[in-house]
């Protein structure tokens, strides 16, 4: 069959790969200048050497990424273990800590004397014990903010641990995290061993940068990928699908929309009531990622430096401010420390900036979670199929799973989907 795939992020690439290997004639349309979406590795020249630095997709783990890992094995792509430490720095109060060890937890020695700091630690342990009970009911409307306040968790735990941790994971600001569905939040934490102090998955990175998997994944159909080709509209009829690209109408038998949910809705010339209802449930937040070498964005104390570093601000409506230490995450040995900061709330020295990139991340609400459950109502209807990480938690594994689900619906089950969450 002649099938159009719109979008070349992980979902678009995997669906195209599956459909191509099943013998279908595919065309992949990408609005941007490169293939990969959030898989965006930047080549940095420094002192005569080139360093591959990731700026979007960085890590995966051996518990909750079974389909992505299987795909990498099939493609022969190598990976390596990494560290996933987390720090919080509050410029207003001066508080900072790194949760890796007792020594780094008390990197700021004053924390030994702070009763509020011990309250936070106590509530971290308490949350690990009590939060899983939330999974025994089906309340999808309760927000994480309502849950912790209802159960009398301390302000220190909420503001200096839970909201920063969630914000760093989902690239969401404090106000957005407060409205995050509690059950969804806890399920993710449980799946990833984040409610335990010892049983944790092994996190990994793609050797040589995340983009290393793009060539082997897209090589079989590289001549069918069209960059700088934003789709303007999609019109469906009984005989096929008409896609308008660069003011040129092209006909296909089916279309796979691997763009964001809100983008998918805008592209449809004739959305059904179900498509309108489901896709309008997904909203996004635009985050600016800056690749730089300005160490002022890291915690003040060297002992508090972590792989992920959350810098608190005073405006809860502001976007998430988090800095990733790419040398630590990717094992980069360079004379400079490469950092990626999302939405800096401290000015970065202009001479230290290497690249600016804009990403959009799903904003999870009870409406979004409800919309996810209605995928079957719109997928395959009017010759249109939907995939994207937004159908899950918003990560690479979710993108792969959604693509395999679409491929199966089109009779192209090249890689059998696994639902395993290793424990």
Model-derived segments and their meaning:
Residues 2-28:
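N-terminal Rossmann-like FAD-binding beta1-loop-alpha1 element of flavoenzymes
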Residues 20-45:
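Glycine-rich FAD pyrophosphate-binding loop
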Residues 43, 100-101, 317-423:
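Conserved flavin/dinucleotide-binding core of flavoenzymes
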Residues 62-182, 186:
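Mobile amphipathic helical/loop "lid" adjacent to a hydrophobic cofactor/ligand pocket
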């Amino acid at each position: 069959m002649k099938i159009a795939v719109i979008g070349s992020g992980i979902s678009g690439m995997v669906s195209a790969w599956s459909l191509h290997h099943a013998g279908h004639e595919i065309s992949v349309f990408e609005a941007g200048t490169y293939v990969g979406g959030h898989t965006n590795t930047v080549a940095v020249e420094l002192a005569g050497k080139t360093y591959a630095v990731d700026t979007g997709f960085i890590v995966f783990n051996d518990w909750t990424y079974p389909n992505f890992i299987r795909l990498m094995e099939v493609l022969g792509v190598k990976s390596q273990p990494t560290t996933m430490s987390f720090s919080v720095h509050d410029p207003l109060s001066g508080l900072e800590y790194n949760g890796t060890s007792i020594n780094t937890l008390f990197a700021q020695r004053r924390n030994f004397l702070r009763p509020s700091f011990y309250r936070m630690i106590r509530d971290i342990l308490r949350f690990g014990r009590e939060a899983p009970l939330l999974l025994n009911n089906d309340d999808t409307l309760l927000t994480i903010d309502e849950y912790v306040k209802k159960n009398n968790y301390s302000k220190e735990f909420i503001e200096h641990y839970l909201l920063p941790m969630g914000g760093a994971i989902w690239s969401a600001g404090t106000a957005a995290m407060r409205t995050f569905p509690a059950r969804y939040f806890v399920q993710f934490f449980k799946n990833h061993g984040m409610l335990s102090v010892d049983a944790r998955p092994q996190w990994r990175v793609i050797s040589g940068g995340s983009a290393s998997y793009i060539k082997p994944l897209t090589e079989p159909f590289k001549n069918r990928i069209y960059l700088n080709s934003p789709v303007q509209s999609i019109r469906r009829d009984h005989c096929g699908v008409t896609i308008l690209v660069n003011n040129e109408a092209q006909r296909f038998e089916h279309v796979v929309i691997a763009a964001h949910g809100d983008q998918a809705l805008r592209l449809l010339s004739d959305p059904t009531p179900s498509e309108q209802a489901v896709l309008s449930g997904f909203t996004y937040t635009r985050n600016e990622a800056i690749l730089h070498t300005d160490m002022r964005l890291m915690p003040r104390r060297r002992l508090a430096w972590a792989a992920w570093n959350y810098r608190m601000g005073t405006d809860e409506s502001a976007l998430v401010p988090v800095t990733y230490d790419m040398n630590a995450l990717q094992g980069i040995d360079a004379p400079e420390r490469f950092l990626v900061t999302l939405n800096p709330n401290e000015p970065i020295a202009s001479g230290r900036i290497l690249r600016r990139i804009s990403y959009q991340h799903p904003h999870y609400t009870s409406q979004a979670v409800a919309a996810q459950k209605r995928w079957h109502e719109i997928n395959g209807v009017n010759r249109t199929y939907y995939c994207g990480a937004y159908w899950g938690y918003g990560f690479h594994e979710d993108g792969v799973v959604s693509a395999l689900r679409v491929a199966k619906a089109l009779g192209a089950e090249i890689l059998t989907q696994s639902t395993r969450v290793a424990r």
